[in-house]
Amino acid sequence: MSAQNSLFSGSIVALVTPMNHYGEVDFSCLEKLVEHHIEAGSNALVSVGTTGESATLSIEENVKVIEKTVEFAKGRIPIIAGAGANATSEAITMTKLLRDSGVAGCLSVVPYYNKPTQEGIYQHFKAIAECTNLPQILYNVPSRTGSDMKPETVARLAEIENIVGIKEATGDVSRIVKIKQLAGKNFIVLSGDDATGLEAIKLGAEGVISVTNNIAAKDMADMYRYALVGDFDKAEEINARLMRLHHDLFIESNPIPVKWAAYRLGLIKSSHLRLPLTTLSEEIQPKVEDALKIAGLL
């Protein structure tokens, strides 16, 4: 595994952004989360991605959260910055602002809502890559964006030097094989789907950017450490215990359930989210609590 591949591999946390009851970012809590994941053995953190509520933070807030996450990490764990937008110019602005932030790379989502063609998607990511030397990880999540970046488009983008990988969040593990075939073995493929993450590793993915990791960090780190050395019996044992949790953390829109679960476990002080997201419905809370118990977290 190359140095770059090892930097973006294993158990990567799609980190929540803790907030107080007024909707302000709770930086003291964020610092504790960073320490928690370092101690648990997580391999990297994604700051202000989908799970970090990037859509409801201003550009200035996004940058500050990322910079503080890097500061708290003190070089002990790679930080990947969420830097996507559905306007190419805005994504470029965000990426440029991160130039000297100390991040290991940027995660940039397929433009959402405006539904570009495959050529539009290609030109979008090409323009972002050309504005920076930072490694770029593409992010395909059609269930949220309304656009699906095809493996053939990924392969074209893989020819650009600083586009180094993709977070593939369709949940279709056959995509892992297809992208590896078309983009080459050195192109990093990260699963973005907890329920199929272990299967993705078996098919050649280098790691998983995980929501479950927020609340089961040590289990997830252990599971993917076992998986990446081929000890799938031990990995499957952990995964079976977490499978209910993988599913129930999406029982309402992410990051609603995971923030409530993190609050329930005492990892954050509040389950507050910014509107239009609201805290986990009371009638759903017992179901997520049961999943936490099955996982051995309560």
From Swiss-Prot:
InterPro entries, alphabetized: Aldolase_TIM, DapA, DapA-like, Schiff_base-form_aldolases_AS, Schiff_base-form_aldolases_CS
Molecular-function GO terms, alphabetical: 4-hydroxy-tetrahydrodipicolinate synthase activity
Cellular component terms (Gene Ontology): cytosol
Active site per the UniProt annotation: Y139, K167
Record's keyword terms, sorted: Amino-acid biosynthesis, Cytoplasm, Diaminopimelate biosynthesis, Lyase, Lysine biosynthesis, Schiff base
Catalytic activity: L-aspartate 4-semialdehyde + pyruvate = (2S,4S)-4-hydroxy-2,3,4,5-tetrahydrodipicolinate + H2O + H(+)
Pathway given in the UniProt record: Amino-acid biosynthesis; L-lysine biosynthesis via DAP pathway; (S)-tetrahydrodipicolinate from L-aspartate: step 3/4
Disulphide bridges: none
SUPFAM superfamilies reported for this sequence: Aldolase
Chain sites annotated for binding pyruvate: T51, I209
Subcellular location per the Swiss-Prot or TrEMBL entry: Cytoplasm
Top-tier EC class: lyase
Pfam families the record matches: DHDPS
The organism's place on the tree of life at top rank: Bacteria
One GO term (biological process): diaminopimelate biosynthetic process
EC number: 4.3.3.7
Site (Part of a proton relay during catalysis): T50, Y113
Role summary: Catalyzes the condensation of (S)-aspartate-beta-semialdehyde [(S)-ASA] and pyruvate to 4-hydroxy-tetrahydrodipicolinate (HTPA).
Family designation: Belongs to the DapA family.
Subunit structure, as described in the record: Homotetramer; dimer of dimers.
Protein name, entry field: 4-hydroxy-tetrahydrodipicolinate synthase
Species the sequence originates in: Haemophilus influenzae (strain PittGG)
Gene: dapA
